[in-house]
């Protein structure tokens, strides 16, 4: 299992508003190796909060295929930085799951 976390710092109050954009489904659900997406909210300070957008993939190769796909390009076509954007910064963290215990 391969997990990619996009750690997005946003202006306070925007995480709940933005989160559904990542989990509304669509073509990503039919991609080989896609397992799911969750968005977590982490309070930072009085001015910002973090959203951890976690996507699960069977393999790193499946994730790379997503990033290089037309589906990815379409999903990210309007994500350019603008003056009024609530996004302060973002960072991608890639992880291999070594051990887990699940009860969902």
From Swiss-Prot:
Provide the binding site for heme: 76
Its GO CC terms are: cytoplasm
Q: Where does Fe cation bind?
A: 6
Q: Where in the cell is it found?
A: Cytoplasm
Give the GO terms filed under biological process for this record: heme catabolic process; iron import into cell
GO molecular function per UniProt = heme binding; heme oxygenase (decyclizing) activity; iron ion binding
Q: Which reaction does it catalyse?
A: heme b + 5 AH2 + 4 O2 + 2 H(+) = delta-staphylobilin + Fe(2+) + formaldehyde + 5 A + 4 H2O; heme b + 5 AH2 + 4 O2 + 2 H(+) = beta-staphylobilin + Fe(2+) + formaldehyde + 5 A + 4 H2O
UniProt domain ABM: residue ranges: 2-92
Which E.C. number(s) belong to this protein? 1.14.99.48
* InterPro entries tied to this protein: ABM_dom (IPR007138), Dimeric_a/b-barrel (IPR011008), Heme-degrading_MO (IPR050404), IsdG (IPR023953)
Identify the domain of life.
Answer: Bacteria
Q: Which UniProt keywords apply?
A: Cytoplasm, Heme, Iron, Metal-binding, Monooxygenase, Oxidoreductase
Against PROSITE patterns, the record matches this protein to: ABM (PS51725)
Site, as annotated: Transition state stabilizer:
66
Q: How does it assemble?
A: Homodimer.
Q: Which PANTHER family match?
A: HEME OXYGENASE (STAPHYLOBILIN-PRODUCING) 1, SIGNAL TRANSDUCTION PROTEIN TRAP
Q: What does this protein do?
A: Allows bacterial pathogens to use the host heme as an iron source. Catalyzes the oxidative degradation of the heme macrocyclic porphyrin ring to the oxo-bilirubin chromophore staphylobilin (a mixture of the linear tetrapyrroles 5-oxo-delta-bilirubin and 15-oxo-beta-bilirubin) in the presence of a suitable electron donor such as ascorbate or NADPH--cytochrome P450 reductase, with subsequent release of free iron.
Quote the NCBIfam families the UniProt record gives. PRK13315.1 (NF009840)
Protein family: Belongs to the antibiotic biosynthesis monooxygenase family. Heme-degrading monooxygenase IsdG subfamily.
Q: What is the recorded name of this protein?
A: Heme oxygenase (staphylobilin-producing)
Protein's gene: isdG
């Amino acid at each position: 299992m391969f997990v990619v976390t996009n750690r997005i710092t946003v202006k306070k109050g925007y995480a709940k508003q933005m989160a559904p954009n990542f989990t509304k489904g669509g073509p990503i659900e039919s991609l080989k190796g896609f397992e799911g997406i969750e968005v977590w909210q982490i309070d930072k300070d009085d001015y910002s909060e973090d959203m951890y957008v976690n996507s699960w993939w069977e393999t790193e190769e499946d994730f790379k295929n997503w990033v290089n796909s037309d589906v990815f390009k379409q999903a990210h076509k309007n994500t350019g930085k603008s003056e009024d954007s609530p996004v302060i910064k973002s960072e991608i963290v890639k992880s291999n799951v070594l051990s887990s215990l699940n009860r969902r």
